Amino acid sequence: MKINNNSLITPVLLAGSLIIIITFGIRGSFGIFQIPIENEFQWLRIEFSLALAIQNLGWGIGAPIFGALGEKFGDRKLIIAGAFCYVIGLVLSTFAESPLTHQILEFIIGFGIAGTGMGMILAIVGRASSDKNRLMALGIVTAAGSAGQMIGA
């Protein structure tokens, strides 16, 4: 959807920035829980680290899938689907009692991040921005991701 006005601050920019802040804020906090989880469950540090690496694989695998499906079904539906995967993975991970379960759920979380992360949001904001403000809008969303990581950590 193309916006015809030259306004930099648009509802799409604000919503996209908020989604990125939340997505990367939560993701940025995972490292804080490594030692408490390690101590509570007696997991090796490598098992927790592997789970986060698997999360990145889920993100990488999911990004082109969400991108392709976004073209077919629309951005809004795919962001909702991504958020659903993200939330389901987060909620179920609170019940994970083995490293393998945690790693599988981190894949689901990563897949959800693909639907709510930079690839989807930057594409949406870029399409909705005027030619005059597109680069600034994309920069604002990217900065929102960094702010989310700082807030989450």
Predicted regions, residues:
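Intracellular juxtamembrane helix-capping segments at the cytosolic ends
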Residues: I37, G115-S129
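Hydrophobic core of transmembrane alpha-helices in multi-pass small-molecule transporters
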Residues: T101-T116
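Extracellular/periplasmic helix-loop-helix junction of adjacent transmembrane segments
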Residues: I32-G60
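Residue-level signature of mid-helix packing/kink "hotspots" within the transmembrane helices
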Residues: G28, N56-P64, Q149-M150
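Conserved MFS/SLC helix-loop-helix module at the cytosolic interface between two early adjacent transmembrane helices
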Residues: I61-P99
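Pair of pore-lining "gating" transmembrane helices in MFS-fold secondary transporters
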Residues: S7-S29
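Glycine-rich segments within core transmembrane alpha-helices of 12-TM secondary carriers
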Residues: L135-A153
